[in-house]
Amino acid sequence: MVMEKLGDSLQGALKKLIGAGRIDERTVNEVVKDIQRALLQADVNVKLVMGMSQRIKERAMKEDPPAGMNPREHVIRIVYQELMEIIGKGADIQLKPQTIMMVGLQGSGKTTSAAKLARYFQRKGLKAGVVAADTFRPGAYHQLKTLSEKLNVGFYGEEGNPDAVEITIHGLKALEKYDIKIVDTAGRHALEADLIEEMERIHAVAKPDHKFMVLDAGIGQQASQQAHAFNDSVGITGVIITKLDGTAKGGGALSAVSETKAPIAFIGVGETPEDFEKFEADRFISRLLGMGDLKSLMEKAEESLSEEDVNVEALMQGRFTLKDMYKQLEAMNKMGPLKQIMSMLPMGMGGLGGVKLSDEMFQATSDKMKNYKVIMDSMTEDEMADPKLIGGSRIKRISRGSGCSPEDVRELLKYHKTMQTALKGFRGGKFNIQKMMKKKMGM
């Protein structure tokens, strides 16, 4: 999960609140102290943290809970709202034809983000392409070309041409029929006069709808200075924060950018194209607090899965064969790493009320799922359609064919039976996602 350490610390503070006998001033002070510690360790500005802490204490003691909400839920709601205040709202990204100019310092992940951004829009049904206008950094052309080919997005570049403005003009002409045109500009080690001049010249010919500044989350609170400097020089409409998965200073970067009033547009949370998300503060904070993000999970499923992947009608009628389970495992694999999917589930399903799994346990579970697919590849069509056919002799045959032990085959059959029982429970109305979404935080 993004900023896992901060999320664990915040969830630990809320668990203390949930486990308290009664919500009094002492309990609130203890919880606030834990939240303070978590935010300061994430490099959030001290002044912001102290201001937020004071507001949580005052509101928790003075405000009456809204109708239908108990004191515990009310305090959690206050924490949620105050975190929203210091993180800020995301940028308004519309799915329509537009030109985007990428700016930022060298090493921020700008070129990679340009390709991932194109892929993001392409997944949303828009034709996207990139223009390689970074003529300053050796290798920038080849890097963007390779990434574009890998992600199957449009590309335009002129290897050896040192004129970034000319390349931009030619590139936008070449990508004229594309919905989304992204211009990757050069970075520097500092915001120098020649960089500003080049960006202004590119801006004049590109006439971009958006100028996104790319920042490395590892710089923490320094993000504020960079965002201010770029905004004053060329004006920015949004910020992309990269490498949020690999630093303890992500909270500092997020809150510092918010303080500049420059909206956060996207966040990079890993190496793959799927680890690039539109930033939505409410969803982000929900995941941090262990409340899940079912909306993002559903969107990810819609983008990744086809009707052939999951036969919803059959599942809801209680029909769940090994063939269905095989498709389900393949579908989960398309949606991304198991750990990332689990972080989107609310408390009691992987969040606050769930069991905390280590990286090793997630890996072991993923390996087991792959093993199950190997075992099922050694079964006949009849066996996949009706697991009751699989007796002792068939288990031995499947075991030999898959290279797995008979115990592994039996474990798979037991897992299938458990899943079948669980789905019958869902069918009976014990699991109502819509109801859960409406109840969540009373919002």
Curated annotation (Swiss-Prot):
It holds the Pfam family SRP_SPB. It catalyses: GTP + H2O = GDP + phosphate + H(+). One of its GO terms (cellular component) is signal recognition particle. PROSITE patterns: SRP54 (PS00300). GO terms for molecular function: 7S RNA binding; ATP hydrolysis activity; GTP binding; GTPase activity. The keyword Mitochondrion does not apply. One of its GO terms (biological process) is SRP-dependent cotranslational protein targeting to membrane. It is found in: Cytoplasm. Its main location: cytoplasm. Gene3D superfamilies: P-loop containing nucleotide triphosphate hydrolases (3.40.50.300), Signal recognition particle SRP54, nucleotide-binding domain (1.20.120.140), Signal recognition particle, SRP54 subunit, M-domain (1.10.260.30). The keyword Hydrolase applies. GTP binds at residues 104-111, 184-188, 242-245. SUPFAM superfamilies: Domain of the SRP/SRP receptor G-proteins, P-loop containing nucleoside triphosphate hydrolases, Signal peptide-binding domain. Its EC number is 3.6.5.4. Keywords: Cytoplasm, GTP-binding, Hydrolase, Nucleotide-binding, Ribonucleoprotein, RNA-binding, Signal recognition particle. InterPro entries: AAA+_ATPase, P-loop_NTPase, Signal_recog_part_SRP54_M_sf, Signal_recog_particl_SRP54_hlx, Signal_recog_particle_SRP54_M, SRP/SRP_N, SRP54, SRP54_GTPase_dom. Composed of three domains: the N-terminal N domain, which is responsible for interactions with the ribosome, the central G domain, which binds GTP, and the C-terminal M domain, which binds the RNA and the signal sequence of the RNC. Part of the signal recognition particle protein translocation system, which is composed of SRP and FtsY. Archaeal SRP consists of a 7S RNA molecule of 300 nucleotides and two protein subunits: SRP54 and SRP19. Belongs to the GTP-binding SRP family. SRP54 subfamily. Involved in targeting and insertion of nascent membrane proteins into the cytoplasmic membrane. Binds to the hydrophobic signal sequence of the ribosome-nascent chain (RNC) as it emerges from the ribosomes. The SRP-RNC complex is then targeted to the cytoplasmic membrane where it interacts with the SRP receptor FtsY. This is Signal recognition particle 54 kDa protein.
